[in-house]
Amino acid sequence: MAEGRCSQGKEPAEAMISLVALGEPLIQLNAVTPGPLRYVAYFEKHVAGSEANFCIAATMAGARCSLIARVGDDEFGRNIVEYLRGRGVDVSHVKVDPGAPTGIYFVQRHFPVPGRSRLIYYRKGSAGSRVGPDDVDSSLISSADAVHSTGITLALSDSANRAVHKAFGEAKRRTFDTNIRPALWPDLAAARRAILDVLNYGVDVLVTDPDDTQILLGVRDPEEAYRKYRELGVQTLVYKLGAEGAYVFWNGGSYFRDALKVAVEDPTGAGDAVAGYFVALYLSGVDPRRALDLAVAASALVVGVRGDNEALPSPREAEELLKAL
């Protein structure tokens, strides 16, 4: 197994691939000061949500990315659409739903565990949870190089779950981030059933971590996890280890990328940065080791600020960080 820093393989491809992500964009209210939210006086507002973050990361890495979603007919919904459009994401398939509000969540930082954040959601009955199969444009799906979603979207509602199944059933290629959020599921058995059901479509790139894999497969070891995921039809596995780094396993090889040592302001969004960056580069033909190097660098920049996606770099900026550290 290769380890450490790697500059092998092609530079980020010039050919632009087309991706579609399906999931809920949210408004994030991030505590300006660390500690319990009951004593926080000021919050910063950011646009976030796993698939929205994925799209911005993929766009920064050189892909085209369209988001299928719903937002409320409110100021937060308009904020999301305008912000994503400004970041280069195609929002022509984001519908405005007058019957439900835009979802929000709060970020509690560095409490009770320093260096970690806790997320408190207010998204039940949100516009984003009402996305369904009718929102999935078959012509958009068939024209895309790959479709991406997450375990979060599967958990939102029955209609959102069915939307993912429709999109994955029509997609040329599929990428998926397990992203198990226990607070969104009735129990972990339900999460396991729903995610394994989606993996049956055959996933080209799976992004996950030991905690989610323990729930799904009952194992934590990276190599054992890859063997079991391969049996389920997964082609390439990105296995995140948080502050330690990440593995990538593919047909014929494996590689470990150590994490970059940076000051952590808020780790929220780091995994989405890895997913979007890696998928965009890897599916465009970049060597998986090179793609993971740049994806880990992108995530290192994300955790240094509040907000999930404002610090996402260009490949040149990610490379500059790799050379500096």
From Swiss-Prot:
Q: Which residues bind substrate per the record?
A: G49, S50, E51, A52, N53, Y105, Y121, Y122, R123, R181, D272, D308
Annotated ATP binding lies at N179, I180, R181, K240, L241, G242, A243, E244, G245, G269, A270, G271, D272
Enumerate the Pfam families for this protein. PfkB
The UniProt record lists the EC number as 2.7.1.45
The UniProt keyword set, sorted, is: ATP-binding, Carbohydrate metabolism, Kinase, Nucleotide-binding, Transferase
How would you classify this enzyme at the top EC level?
Answer: transferase
* Active-site residue list: D272
**Partners and quaternary state?**
Homohexamer; trimer of dimers.
State what this protein does. Answer: Involved in the degradation of glucose via the semi-phosphorylative Entner-Doudoroff pathway. Catalyzes the phosphorylation of 2-keto-3-deoxygluconate (KDG) yielding 2-keto-3-deoxy-6-phosphogluconate (KDPG).
The protein, known as: 2-dehydro-3-deoxygluconokinase
Source species? Thermoproteus tenax
